[in-house]
């Protein structure tokens, strides 16, 4: 999970081969910028192809890139 200050303006997250940036101006909406989006999309597609992966890998991304995400839940495991 990510612990970011509530008033952050720029925050980076490094996933394998992909860097994700959160950018926010004041109280405005948060922008999500992904370097190498083709790699990020490939990671998601690969997660869908894993046997018995009923959630498609999105729990990993939800828990790891949202700055306001809750901690891991039983569903995430």
Curated annotation (Swiss-Prot):
GO process terms (BP): catabolic process
GO molecular function: epoxide hydrolase activity
The enzyme's E.C. designation: 3.3.2.10
Catalytic activity: an epoxide + H2O = an ethanediol
Keyword field contains Transmembrane: no
UniProtKB keywords: Aromatic hydrocarbons catabolism, Hydrolase
Function: This enzyme acts on aliphatic epoxides. Its substrates include epichlorohydrin, epibromohydrin, epoxyoctane and styrene epoxide.
Subunit relationships: Monomer.
Full protein name: Epoxide hydrolase
């Amino acid at each position: 999970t990510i612990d970011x200050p509530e008033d952050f303006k720029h925050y980076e997250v490094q996933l394998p081969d992909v860097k994700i940036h959160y950018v926010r101006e004041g109280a405005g909406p948060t922008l999500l910028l992904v370097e190498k989006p083709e790699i990020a999309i490939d990671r998601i597609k690969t997660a869908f192809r894993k046997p018995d992966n009923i959630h498609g890998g999105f729990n990993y991304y939800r828990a790891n890139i949202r700055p306001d995400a809750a901690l891991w839940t039983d569903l995430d495991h």
